[in-house]
Amino acid sequence: MVGVGSRMGWNEAVASGRAMLEGVERIRLPGAELGVELAGLDWGGEGELVVMHHANGFCAATLAPLAVMLRDRFRVVALDARGHGDSTSVKPGPANEGYDWETLALDSERAIAGVFEKTGHDRVALAIGHSFGGALLLRVAERLGPQIERLLLCDPVLLPPLTHEQIAVRSNGAGLAAATRKRRNVFPSLEAAYEHCSTRGLFADFTPEALALYISEGMAEDQTGEATLKCDREVEAAIFDGGAFAAVAEGVGEAAAQVLFVHAERGNFIRAYYEEVAGRMPNASVTGGDFGHLFPLESPATAVEFVDSMFEK
C-alpha cells in the first residue's frame, strides 16, 4: 500500500481519489431534528447493504478506498456526520449542544432509516464504524437490534467512565479538543493543503487517495481558490469534548449483531475495556493488529480482511 510518504503529487493523487467516486450518487438523508440533513455517498450495486461511518473531523469520502474494495459484493453507503463533509452544520452550544453523542447517534439512526427507504433494504448486513463513527454505530445497533446484522468497529472511541476531574483534563488541557482548536484550517489552495498535510505525522501513512479526498471533499474553496475545512474546528472539538460524557456502552446487551472490535495496538484505547464491553454482548469478540488508530485510511485492505472474516462465520 502506497502512503503519502511516497510523495505522490496532488494532481495524480486527486485524480486517483476522484476516480473512486465515479458513479457514486450523492444523497441527502434525514437527521435527528428538523433542518438537519446528513449527506451520503451511495456506490450502488445489487449486493447486501453495507453502511460506513468515518472518524471525527474526516468525511465519508475518505472511506472511498475501502468502499471500492467492497462495491463488487455489496451496496455500499457512507455517511457524513453533521458538521462534516456536506451534511448540515450547526453551531455548538456552550455545553456542546447539538454535538452530544446521543444526538449524533440518533442522526445516524435516522439516516440509516433513510437509506432503507432509498435502497429497498430492510437491514444492514454490515455496519463499519471507524473511531467515533464506531461508537455511534454501536449505539445505533443497540437501538435497531436485528436490523444491524454485523458490526465492525475499527478502534472505536470507547472509554471507561471518567471522573469530573478527568473530564476537565481531557477537555481543557493538552487533549484532542484543545489541540483541535489550534489546528490550521485555512490554506491558499487545495494543493497547498495537500502539501501541508503530507508533511504532518497524523497523515503520514494515509493512502494518497484518502488524503486527497480528505482535502478535495472535506474542504471548500472560495472564489479565490482559498480552501477551508468544512468541519469547523469548534465542531470537531465539541465532539471530542462530548466523547468524555458519552454513555455509548450502557445498552450494549441489546445489540443483536455479530460484533467485531478491532483494537489498534499502536493506538491509545484500552483493549481490556473492549473485551469487558464485548463480554456484555451476546455475540461479540475482540481482535487486534500491529497498526495505528487510523488504519482504515492507511491500509483499507486490512479493514477488508476483517470484513471477510465476519462473513466466513
What is each of the regions a protein language model found here?
Residues M1-L29, L41:
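An N-terminal hydrophobic leader/cap segment in hydrolases
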Residues L34, A81-I128, E305:
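Active-site loop/oxyanion-hole signature of alpha/beta-hydrolase fold enzymes
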Residues A39-K91:
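Conserved HGGG/HGGXW glycine-rich cap/lid loop of the alpha/beta-hydrolase fold
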Residues D122-Q166:
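Conserved hydrolase catalytic core segment
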Residues P161-T224:
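Helix-rich cap/lid subdomain of alpha/beta-hydrolase
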Residues E209, M219-G279:
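Conserved serine/cysteine hydrolase catalytic core
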Residues R280-H293:
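Catalytic histidine neighborhood in serine/cysteine hydrolases
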Residues F291-V304:
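Catalytic histidine-centered segment of alpha/beta-hydrolase-like enzymes
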